[in-house]
Amino acid sequence: MSYNITSSNQYQYFAAMWAEPTAMLNQCVSALSQSYQTQAARDTVRQQFSNLLSAIVTPNQRFPETGYRMYINSAVLKPLYESLMKSFDTRNRIIETEEESRPSASEVANATQRVDDATVAIRSQIQLLLNELSNGHGLMNRAEFEVLLPWATAPAT
């Protein structure tokens, strides 16, 4: 028994693009209360989001029988998740100085504004993702999944 793959675009469902909905919702809520003043803090939270994703099906392993799973590659969630991941990466854009060891007052002010802008962008993207998850977008159960990718059972003998 296996999934009946009839199109090359169906392989995307076997990738590590799935998350437990409650875990992702909890991560969003937790991340909204975090401080993003350092790149290390942004990297940590980005990694926490990334760690929630896993592969839940293979060509021979069926979608879980109960519950829903979040598919991050859905049309609604993919652009939000990608924007969130990009908003965490402010390395080499926060402080740009003539002399790294002695930034001027205007360079420090500019860097402070960039950190604030990055924090606003991160929180905004998290809130957008949280809103869509709360509305049930990108969630699938076995029945919905198997409409997209039918499970082929062995013929009865």
Swiss-Prot record:
Listed InterPro entries: TMV-like_coat, TMV-like_coat_sf
Single GO molecular function: structural molecule activity
The keyword Glycoprotein appears for this protein: no
A cellular component annotation (GO) from this entry: helical viral capsid
PTM sites of type N-acetylserine: S2
Locations listed in the record: Virion
UniProt keyword list: Acetylation, Capsid protein, Helical capsid protein, Virion
Domain of life: Viruses
Main location: virion
Statement: the UniProt record of this protein carries the keyword Acetylation: yes
Family (UniProt): Belongs to the virgaviridae capsid protein family.
Function: Capsid protein self-assembles to form rod-shaped virions about 18 nm in diameter with a central canal enclosing the viral genomic RNA.
Name of protein: Capsid protein
Taxonomic source organism: Ribgrass mosaic virus
Encoding gene per record: CP
